[in-house]
C-alpha cells in the first residue's frame, strides 16, 4: 500500500487507527492480495474517497458496502464509476430518484460522481478493496473498523452533516451518529432488488438540501 496517500485533515483524525495492530495486519493482508490477484480499485485509489473530500469540507456522507468488483468499474468512490463505463443498475436508480425528487437530471459526469464529491459529498465504502469478481472478499479483515472510525470522527467532531444510509448494512451505522447533531436519512438500497420497496420516493436529495439550507450551508447540486 505504498502508493496510498490520505488527505491531511483525515490523516490527523485517523492517525490513531494507522498506529493500531489491526491496521498493520490489514496493510499486510491488502499488500499481499495486490501482489497475488487482480484487486479493485487500483491501489492508488484505495483512499480516494478521503483524498477527494477533505474532512473539514464534508457536508453529506453516502455509505456503500464494497467496491465494484468487475474490470474498470471501481474508482475508490462508493456507487461511482469512471466516465465512459456503463452506469450500474443501482446508480441508474439513484439518478432516477434524483430526477423525480428534484425535477432535474443528475449532475454527474457519465457515471462519475466526482461533481458531487467536489461539493462535499463523501462517497465511502465500508470495505475499501475487493478481489476481482468476488463480492465481499475483503470483508472482515479490518476495513470496517477503519471506516467506522471515520464515520465516528465525523459524527463527533463535525455538526449538521447529512448521512444517507441505504440498505440494511448502511442503516446499522446509524447507532454511531447523534440525530440531535446530524440528519440521518434511511431507505432501502437502490439496487433493482429493493429500490421499489422505498428507495424510490424517499426524496433524500431534496430533504438533504432543505436541511443544509436550514443550517446556512450551501446545498448540493445533485
UniProtKB/Swiss-Prot annotation:
It is found in: Cytoplasm. GO terms for biological process: base-excision repair, AP site formation via deaminated base removal. SMART domains: UDG, UreE_C. GO terms for cellular component: cytoplasm. It catalyses: Hydrolyzes single-stranded DNA or mismatched double-stranded DNA and polynucleotides, releasing free uracil. The active site is at 66 (proton acceptor). CDD domains: UDG-F1-like (cd10027). Excises uracil residues from the DNA which can arise as a result of misincorporation of dUMP residues by DNA polymerase or due to deamination of cytosine. This is Uracil-DNA glycosylase. It comes from Porphyromonas gingivalis (strain ATCC 33277 / DSM 20709 / CIP 103683 / JCM 12257 / NCTC 11834 / 2561). The gene is ung.
Amino acid at each position: 500500500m505504498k502508493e496510498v496517500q490520505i488527505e491531511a485533515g483525515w490523516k490527523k483524525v485517523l492517525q490513531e487507527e494507522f498506529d493500531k495492530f489491526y491496521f498493520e495486519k490489514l496493510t499486510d493482508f491488502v499488500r499481499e492480495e495486490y501482489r497475488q490477484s487482480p484487486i479493485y480499485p487500483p491501489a492508488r485509489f484505495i483512499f480516494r474517497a478521503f483524498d477527494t473530500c477533505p474532512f473539514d469540507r464534508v457536508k453529506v456522507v453516502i455509505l456503500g458496502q464494497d467496491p465494484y468488483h468487475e474490470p474498470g468499474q471501481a474508482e475508490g468512490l462508493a456507487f461511482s464509476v469512471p466516465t465512459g463505463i456503463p452506469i450500474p443498475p443501482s446508480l441508474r436508480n439513484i439518478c432516477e430518484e434524483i430526477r423525480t425528487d428534484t425535477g432535474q437530471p443528475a449532475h454527474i459526469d457519465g457515471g462519475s460522481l466526482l461533481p458531487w464529491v467536489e461539493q462535499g459529498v463523501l462517497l465511502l465504502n465500508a470495505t475499501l478493496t475487493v478481489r476481482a469478481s468476488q463480492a465481499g472478499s475483503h470483508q472482515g479483515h479490518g476495513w470496517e473498523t477503519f471506516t467506522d472510525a471515520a464515520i465516528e470522527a465525523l459524527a463527533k467532531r463535525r455538526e449538521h452533516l447529512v448521512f444517507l444510509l441505504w440498505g440494511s448494512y448502511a442503516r446499522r451505522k446509524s447507532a454511531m451518529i447523534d440525530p440531535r447533531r446530524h440528519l440521518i436519512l434511511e431507505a432501502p438500497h437502490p439496487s433493482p432488488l429493493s429500490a421499489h420497496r422505498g428507495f424510490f420516493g424517499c426524496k433524500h436529495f431534496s430533504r438533504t438540501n432543505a436541511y443544509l439550507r436550514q443550517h446556512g450551508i450551501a446545498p448540493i447540486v445533485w
